[in-house]
């Protein structure tokens, strides 16, 4: 799967970069295109190299044990323990035990899996690094960004250099995984399919940018990072912000919000699973809106992006209604807080809903009962962020 994905991406990159801008001297355009082609080729080579490295380590372990397939660690929601802990916790026997388990599950490439119990037993030789066949390591569902933050806090609390070393390896994976255009795939090394899209879904871009922002500032639990690491993180963050601005969707001449995924080359909103359409998304975009408002001295472009996204939320909010997961219709409730559909149709801003058969509907009641019960089609999470926006807007009024 990976080889096909990488080859396709490389071909698209080369094809896209053969076009020149008439306003740009041909020599400049050609040089830029050639450099971008080299950048993408190097990126894909890094992905292949790290994938081979991860596979080789596990293969060597299995061979030494006389096994042909790895055992699996215990699955769990998130990581099996409360990750919001005070610094003193990392000095306790329980904190040290869990952090040792986290160290054991770090892949040779530097990342971690999702839905893997990291509060139970440490990873054993010949055991997979996560519960899934693919997507190891990943940035999905807070994986890798969560472990990196925990390691920084553990090092701050204990001074154990193992935590710092593992932190640095994880940080390097984030830097290596960043696309030349500034975005991140869901998993790296690349695994193909929609997982290779630039991913806003489940706050993935947000989570990685928060880590980089913290490293770049070098304060609190990140005060141990070197000046070089801070500068590198800042440069990576700036590339990510450029990608965020470039992927903010323009609809009918107006800046709106973002998709859950964007194509890694065209930067347009892209489809993921059958019921996750190429669309504007309220749930994922609000995380990015929130992050942009944390930046000191935001540029005019970022200020405009925030105001535009907030205006879109105001224009698309649903009032006087509630929805209970699984129900086929909305319920009238006059004093209900505003809510939003998860997905909005590109170009029309109409709420849309998908199903496992790739069908798209304008009413949640048209979706199968299984998907109505198994997916969050509406959200009111933007309300809290929009309250913060009201204060932010006074400090940074729209030009």
Task: Describe the function of each predicted region.
Residues 83-145, 150:
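N-terminal carbohydrate-binding/catalytic regions of secreted carbohydrate-active enzymes
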Residues 97-111, 166-183, 234-253, 305-322:
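Long, well-ordered core segments of solenoidal/helical folds
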Residues 105, 154-157, 177, 215-218, ...:
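Residue-level signature of the C-terminal ends
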Residues 164, 168-171, 175, 192-248, ...:
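Eukaryote-skewed repeat-based solenoidal scaffolds used as protein-protein interaction platforms
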């Amino acid at each position: 799967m990976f080889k096909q994905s990488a080859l396709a991406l490389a071909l698209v990159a080369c094809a896209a970069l053969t076009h020149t801008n008439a306003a740009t001297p041909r020599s400049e355009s050609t040089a830029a295109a050639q450099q971008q082609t080299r950048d993408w080729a190097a990126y894909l080579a890094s992905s292949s190299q790290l994938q081979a490295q991860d596979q080789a380590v596990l293969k060597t372990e299995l061979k030494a044990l006389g096994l042909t397939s790895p055992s699996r660690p215990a699955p769990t929601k998130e990581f099996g323990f409360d990750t919001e802990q005070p610094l003193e916790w990392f000095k306790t026997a329980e904190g040290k035990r869990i952090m040792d388990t986290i160290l054991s599950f770090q892949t040779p490439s530097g990342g971690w899996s999702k839905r893997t119990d990291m509060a139970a037993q440490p990873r054993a030789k010949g055991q997979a690094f996560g519960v899934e066949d693919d997507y190891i390591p990943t940035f999905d569902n807070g994986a890798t960004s969560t472990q990196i933050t925990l390691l920084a806090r553990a090092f701050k609390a204990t001074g154990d250099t193992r935590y710092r070393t593992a932190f640095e390896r994880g940080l390097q994976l984030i830097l290596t995984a960043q696309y030349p255009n500034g975005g991140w795939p869901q998993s790296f090394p690349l695994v193909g399919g929609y997982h290779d899209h630039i991913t806003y879904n489940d706050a993935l871009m947000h989570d990685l940018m928060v880590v980089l922002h913290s490293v770049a500032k070098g304060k609190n639990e990140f005060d141990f990072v070197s000046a070089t690491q801070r500068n590198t993180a800042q440069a990576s963050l700036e590339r990510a912000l450029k990608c965020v601005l470039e992927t903010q969707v323009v609809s009918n001449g107006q800046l709106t919000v973002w998709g859950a995924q964007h194509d890694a080359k065209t930067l347009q909103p892209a489809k993921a699973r059958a019921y996750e359409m190429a669309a504007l998304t309220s749930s994922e975009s609000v995380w990015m809106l929130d992050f942009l408002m944390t930046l000191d001295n935001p540029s005019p472009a970022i200020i405009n992006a925030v105001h535009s996204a907030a205006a879109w939320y105001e224009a698309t909010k649903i009032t006087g209604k509630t929805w209970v997961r699984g129900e086929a219709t909305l319920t009238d409730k006059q004093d209900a807080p505003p809510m939003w559909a998860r997905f909005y149709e590109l170009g029309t801003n109409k709420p849309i809903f998908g199903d496992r058969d790739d069908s798209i509907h304008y009413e949640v009641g048209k979706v199968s009962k299984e998907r109505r019960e198994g997916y969050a089609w509406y959200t009111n999470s933007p309300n809290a962020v929009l309250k913060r926006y009201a204060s932010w807007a006074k400090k940074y009024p729209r030009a």
